[in-house]
Swiss-Prot record:
Source species of the chain: Methanococcus maripaludis (strain DSM 14266 / JCM 13030 / NBRC 101832 / S2 / LL)
Protein family: Belongs to the NDK family.
Compartment list: Cytoplasm
Keyword Transcription regulation: no
GO annotation terms (biological process): CTP biosynthetic process; GTP biosynthetic process; UTP biosynthetic process
Active-site positions on this chain: H115 (pros-phosphohistidine intermediate)
Main location per the UniProt record: cytoplasm
Name of the featured protein: Nucleoside diphosphate kinase
InterPro entries, alphabetized: NDK-like_dom (IPR034907), NDK-like_dom_sf (IPR036850), Nucleoside_diP_kinase (IPR001564), Nucleoside_diP_kinase_AS (IPR023005)
Function text: Major role in the synthesis of nucleoside triphosphates other than ATP. The ATP gamma phosphate is transferred to the NDP beta phosphate via a ping-pong mechanism, using a phosphorylated active-site intermediate.
Cofactor names: Mg(2+)
Entry keyword set: ATP-binding, Cytoplasm, Kinase, Magnesium, Metal-binding, Nucleotide metabolism, Nucleotide-binding, Phosphoprotein, Transferase
């Protein structure tokens, strides 16, 4: 079984969509093995999104991700990383297919509901950052 990291962004919490998004993962047979709600500090957000430092959207992303509570999760299941990424849809909600999480709930970037690890290495790094392993 593979594990991946998923973060429900501040817009998901604010719009009371947490349960609906989690239900999608459970309906696909995934298991939520760890979960916590927190507000990112500036330092944690900068470490989390360090790969984007210097890009035009970086400051806006950091400001958004520290604007409210997020839900950090570890999800386990068969091919979790690739399947969860497909379930999310395109990063930009306007380009995401209906039936995907971003297509159904996303508003705009960065308020696109959710983040999920894109590789095994990213999943391990993000799980360690949020759950201390």
């Amino acid at each position: 079984m593979e594990r991946t990291f998923v973060a429900l962004k501040p817009d998901t919490v604010e719009r009371k969509l947490v349960g609906r998004v989690i239900q999608r993962f459970e309906d696909r047979g995934f298991e939520i093995v760890e979960m916590r709600m927190l507000t990112l500090t500036m330092e944690m957000a900068e470490e989390y999104y360090g790969e984007h430092k210097g890009k035009e959207f970086y400051e806006r992303l950091i400001k958004f991700m520290t604007s409210g509570r997020i839900v950090a999760m570890v999800i386990k299941g068969e091919r979790a990383i690739s399947t969860v990424r497909k379930m999310l849809g395109n990063t930009c909600p306007c380009d995401a297919e209906p039936g995907t999480i971003r297509g159904d709930f996303g508003l705009y970037t960065p308020a696109n509901i959710i983040h999920a690890s894109d590789s095994l290495e990213s999943a391990e790094r993000e799980i360690d950052l949020f759950f201390g392993r």
